[in-house]
Amino acid sequence: QFEELLHNLGSLSKEDEDWARRYTMFCDRVARLLATTGLRADLRYDIAETLSDWRTILKFVDLPANILDFGAGCARQGLSAYLRHPDNIYTAIDGTLAGYTIQNTVLSCMDALSPKSAFCDFLDYEVATKPYPDISQAEKGSRFHVPVWMAEVVIPERFYDVVIAAHVHNELSGYDCT
């Protein structure tokens, strides 16, 4: 199946190869935080799918862009957005604990490697009883993390250039799909 993905992608540009190298290097660093045995994830499918996703995205929007990732999984789209253009504004939304936790780890690592802090997790603001940031007033390069139950209140209308919902359909209940 991986060979089929590669075949469908066609040849990789130097930019694609550079992106894949930086993506893998970043994921390796995050993996060292999570597993001390040297175990690493097989990123082949993530890389192939993400390259395919971004080839489509870039046909419709120029970067930097405002990107909403609903059901952000392991935050691969957020990492890709960051690696492709540091001024992209990225918002991850999720409602599952495991997904939210790994997204927080990835987005926090991105923030630690950035020249200035640009990451805001809305759960942190809720716990601290502080007012939520206004995403519509975000500075270039900002990254936001929003639990799904807050989305209706804090996600601005008509703000995003791209909405990504990769692999979300199978997680929705039958009621949500009708």
PLM regions: where:
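Conserved SAM-binding motif I beta-strand of class I
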Residues: 89-94
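A short, conserved alpha-helix within the catalytic core of class I
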Residues: 171-178
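Conserved class I S-adenosyl-L-methionine
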Residues: 64-73
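A short acidic, Gly/Pro-enriched loop at the edge of an enzyme's catalytic core
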Residues: 153-163
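S-adenosyl-L-methionine
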Residues: 107-155
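Conserved alpha-helix/loop element of class I SAM-dependent methyltransferases that forms part
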Residues: 47-64
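Conserved SAM-binding loop of SAM-dependent methyltransferases across substrates and taxa
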Residues: 74-86
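N-terminal accessory regions of S-adenosyl-L-methionine
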Residues: 1-48, 133
